Amino acid sequence: MIKVISYQSKYKPDFKRLNLEWLDKYNLTESHDLEILDDPQGTVIDRGGCIFLAIEGERVVGTAGLWKENEKEYELIKMTVDPVYRGQGISKILLDRCLTEAGKLKAEKVFLFSNSQLQTALKLYGKYGFCNVEVTDAPFLTADVKMELSLALNQ
């Protein structure tokens, strides 16, 4: 049974391993990624964001988080599922949790940066109502997709 928990430092190696797996696979790893993966507490949580972990037993099988851009906007970050566990709806569980948390934080918008190679993820975001927008202010050189979801009407 999959449960979603808030980030705990004991799972830092799993958070890093799972994210580097997909970043390296698609040759997308950048210094900004490594800053977050090396210090999720300091770079995300202490700045007002959050990270969630999907757990089966004691095994971390997925991650996702919200990076606080400002009081009204959060970036969906580091969403991944262990390849062995893909296709089981874990991404949906993590995305639901992030969007619920964004609502609690009174976010008006959640946005994300991605890469056009990641078609499965992009389709999922589209199903949730994320819309493609012009790529601006991307923290990643490899980000060729930006999507946004307005939450303002849901509050």
Stretch-by-stretch model annotation:
Residues 6-77, 82-84, 95-97, 101, ...:
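Acetyl-CoA-dependent GNAT
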Residues 7, 108-122, 126-128, 134-155:
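C-terminal "cap" of GNAT-fold acetyltransferases
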Residues 59, 74, 79-96, 103-105, ...:
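Conserved glycine-rich acetyl-CoA-binding loop
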Residues 1-3:
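Extreme N-terminal starter segment of soluble prokaryotic enzymes
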